[in-house]
Amino acid sequence: MGNIAILAGGDSTLLPKDHDVYVGVDGGCLKLLEQGLPLDIAVGDFDSVSETDLRQIRTQAKQVVQSVPEKNDTDLELALKVAFEAYPDAAVTVYGAFGGRLDHFLSNIFLPTDPDLAPYIEQIQLVDGQNRLIYRPAGCHEIQPDPAMSYVGFMPVGQGRLEITGAKYPLHQENYFLKAMYGSNEFLDQPIQVSLDRGYLVIVYSKDRG
């Protein structure tokens, strides 16, 4: 199974129609159905939907994984674990992960901190109309430009030392400075080389609101 879309909520109009599997998270299940897309797996505690909506979800979903509200995982974390358990080699794109509650937003950014999701770090991306977020483990990586985006930022997680080569604003031993987020960098008609000695790297492609 190649590509999985997980809709966590938010704007569903950006959702491509060519994913192999569609997973709805809580209220995101209804947005999938509203777009006429299949609801292959419904995941969540469903505390944000009415009883009528929950009956609709149960009727139309091919599989329902309902959790209790009091749990260690967020609904999105649970959805990712369910998806990778069923399709361990899939590439997963998460839509609707950047809006809503700030605590959920931060949890979504740091998904690979969960040891159950860490093995799939390079298979997860988070997307909305203005941003695309991917992850890389410690080591050396070549980062390709995204033609749809204007900027790229790098956030090392885990107190690792980051080096950036081939970008408009390089970062190396001679000019090193410590920041939580190295934002607003740009490509120079070539891939960017990054290296991180420990932890993992959050890479954020972005563009200005148009």
Residue ranges and their predicted role:
Residues 60-68, 119-125, 147-155, 159-161:
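A glycine-rich helix N-cap at a beta->alpha junction
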Residues 1-57:
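N-terminal beta-strand-loop-alpha-helix module at the start
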Residues 91-139:
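Anionic-ligand-binding alpha/beta catalytic cores of soluble enzymes and soluble regulatory domains
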Residues 7, 23-25, 66, 125-128:
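General beta-strand structural signal in soluble alpha/beta enzymes
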Residues 1-2, 20, 88-91, 122:
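Short coil/turn segments at beta-strand junctions that form active-site/ligand-binding loops
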Residues 64-87:
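Short phosphate-binding loop-to-helix
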Residues 129-131, 136-210:
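Long, charged alpha-helical interface segments
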